[in-house]
Amino acid sequence: VSCSDEAVENGRVPLEVYNIVDYILGLEKEDRQSNPARNTYYKTFSSPMQRALTSYCQSGGNLLISGSYIGSDMNNSQGDREFTQNLLKYAYGQSITDSYSGNISGLGRTFSSPRLPNEYAYPVTAPECILPTGGAFPVLTYNSGNQSAAIAYQGNYRTFVMGFPFESIEKETDRNAIMASILQFLTTDSRK
């Protein structure tokens, strides 16, 4: 099932009925400079979304999140930082602004995400380093600087959070293999 974030935020789509939720943020972020109304329509995790994801995780849900601005967009208030650190289990490290390499390693693979404009995919000009918190661990690293590109957490619920858009992985074979690893992590019952 696919739906808009607004459908989740207003309660039309209850997350608790799904074993796994994939929240794809792409390049979404709050943009107060080009938005004269100064609203938070494009905020990565609005207050209603934070409530929905908190409820979902507290019910034992499994969450995959990916996006270029999931750290920096949530680093401006203590409440936003507490949400990402305490529930999603990551903290913002920094944005990578060089364009030298889009190579990422982990889960038995090295793959790439475009950093410069091209005719095949949108560029991820500033992927984010996200740091594990509260029992989470790094699972993917950016090859330039060996910094954390994705974290995973396993407790009463599970999270797999990527500091770049999943859909930006260039090769289909890499996307398929990475998704298979993510789904295995999110669905494996550790109590067996």
Task: Name every feature range the model reports, one short phrase each.
Residues 10-13, 41-48, 170-174:
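Extracytoplasmic/periplasmic, Sec-exported soluble proteins
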Residues 25, 60, 162:
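Active-site beta-strand/loop signature of hydrolases that rely on acidic residues for catalysis
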Residues 29-125, 129-136, 141-143:
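A glycine-rich, often tryptophan-bearing local segment used as a flexible ligand/cofactor-contacting loop or short
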Residues 5-12, 47-52, 144-149:
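Alpha-helical scaffolding within the catalytic cores
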Residues 1-27, 68, 157, 165-169, ...:
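Aromatic-Pro/Gly-enriched surface loop or interdomain linker
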